[in-house]
Amino acid sequence: MARGLPTIASLARLCQKLNRLKPLEDSTMETSLRRCLSTLDLTLLGVGGMVGSGLYVLTGAVAKEVAGPAVLLSFGVAAVASLLAALCYAEFGARVPRTGSAYLFTYVSMGELWAFLIGWNVLLEYIIGGAAVARAWSGYLDSMFSHSIRNFTETHVGSWQVPLLGHYPDFLAAGIILLASAFVSCGARVSSWLNHTFSAISLLVILFIVILGFILAQPHNWSADEGGFAPFGFSGVMAGTASCFYAFVGFDVIAASSEEAQNPRRSVPLAIAISLAIAAGAYILVSTVLTLMVPWHSLDPDSALADAFYQRGYRWAGFIVAAGSICAMNTVLLSLLFSLPRIVYAMAADGLFFQVFAHVHPRTQVPVAGTLAFGLLTAFLALLLDLESLVQFLSLGTLLAYTFVATSIIVLRFQKSSPPSSPGPASPGPLTKQQSSFSDHLQLVGTVHASVPEPGELKPALRPYLGFLDGYSPGAVVTWALGVMLASAITIGCVLVFGNSTLHLPHWGYILLLLLTSVMFLLSLLVLGAHQQQYREDLFQIPMVPLIPALSIVLNICLMLKLSYLTWVRFSIWLLMGLAVYFGYGIRHSKENQRELPGLNSTHYVVFPRGSLEETVQAMQPPSQAPAQDPGHME
């Protein structure tokens, strides 16, 4: 038995390492980066991340092939669904005004390993997303010049037919990424100025499209003669919602930039709300005028807006639309390349990624090494790869990040607030970490509840009715309820997505299983709602927690389950690569690991003796607090 104890202890220690949290420090406003971004800067950064190629490509494709004129309803529902995730990011961005976005939010609430995996996937999302936008930018510009750029490259450089590779090397896409990376490395102010310029042009072009589009509108294009407003029915609207949801994924760049915001606790929630409203308004208005200008079934899915003006005889307007699309894609590219090195910087600053990427240039106050290194990597991928097959891969990483952030909001709301640390002789140093194996759940006999319950405790008003939940330590019931909620959310998603097509459930079995899982889901929400939460009047907080984060989780799970199995296979391979990096480097170099080095912590592992409670409590006391021995027994 004694030989097994070290193995059990080592496994327990490993689990402790994997789930250790990054502490929320009081000095969250101190940073090596330059806090220079205003609310307007953050808002335009978010608008640039959302209103890009999707407006000029996705709108026409969904209208023609999925939803018809009802695409505007698809965008409206998708905007509401995105708002659920955006609210979670807004609260975290105000509460933790540091760079890192979903990675950091997961680190402070759920644990180190989960945070690393989320950060690892967000990195890939930005890299592949930047390369895809650059190739779309190159292709759109090439089409304006009758594909002369592609023809020249294939003639003088060559082409190939290799799986996962493009038909020809896209030097233009690689070049625009390198140029954008150079501007981003010059500082946040330079990037913000460029983003302002391109965003202003893009918004003016959108305004032009809406005004001229309403002038040219022909309401009979929504009539029954043309197929009606919703030719694909309700199912088409919902299928369009799944596609349109990805048009709003750019708001997380605001949270990733919160460490450079002048007043993040106010600016981040405000910028997320305003940018999402602007993006939703732009998508809904443009899809409305597009389907009113020409019949939805005559749209060109590759360049719907420009082609619509061509069909109405306004070729000059088509060139304005093409110029606006180029500017819009520039804003998306700048937003992605601006956020990418900041995620790398956050992970490197925490010791989970290579330390060279934590270096901040003293003059520009930006992580130049990460900007240039990952800019080169993105350019290389854009040069060679055919990224169409990896688009769904981006969706999976984004949805997974949304799910973890929503879960983190619930976890953090029911955690006990950290008392502010005061510097002094009695305070532990910056590399000191105090832990206990079970003292977090220890309550002395005879302790009564305080007048103000702690987060995670049962609400006093409900104790007469739910007293059977009151005998547990704060947070214990919440943890179980959260686990049941997540399990039931996954089951609901599986039933909705696979119930008829894959599982081949009979109708009564489908309804029964969906009803049972929904009841479990609602009961877990009621149990969570019966417990005390953190309330901060000085910060933005989401209303209706845990309902809003829970709805976001269910939606994200359903969308993830709709992705192809090849996407999950590629995702698993990427996760394995991330685990190799974490266990090979991150777990040993983590800053939290440095705080736990021998001599820098005060961790006490307790083995319960076969004695009374009094003996157990005495055994837990540190040596300095042990009762003095009888002088007669001293040697």
Swiss-Prot record:
Membrane-traversing stretches: 42-62, 66-86, 113-133, 197-217, 229-249, 270-290, 318-338, 365-385, 391-411, 478-498, 508-528, 539-559, 567-587
GO cellular component: membrane; plasma membrane
Gene Ontology molecular function: amino acid transmembrane transporter activity; basic amino acid transmembrane transporter activity
Gene Ontology BP term (one): amino acid transport
Record InterPro entries: AA/rel_permease1, CAT_C
In-chain residues carrying the UniProt-annotated modification Phosphoserine: 422, 427
Record membrane topology: Multi-pass membrane protein
Pfam families hit by this protein: AA_permease_2, AA_permease_C
Keyword Iron-sulfur tagged: no
Predominant cellular place of this UniProt entry's protein: membrane
Keywords in alphabetical order: Amino-acid transport, Glycoprotein, Membrane, Phosphoprotein, Transmembrane, Transmembrane helix, Transport
Location in or out of the cell: Membrane
Function summary: Involved in the transport of the cationic amino acids (arginine, lysine and ornithine).
Family named by the database record: Belongs to the amino acid-polyamine-organocation (APC) superfamily. Cationic amino acid transporter (CAT) (TC 2.A.3.3) family.
Descriptive protein name: Cationic amino acid transporter 4
Organism field: Homo sapiens (Human)
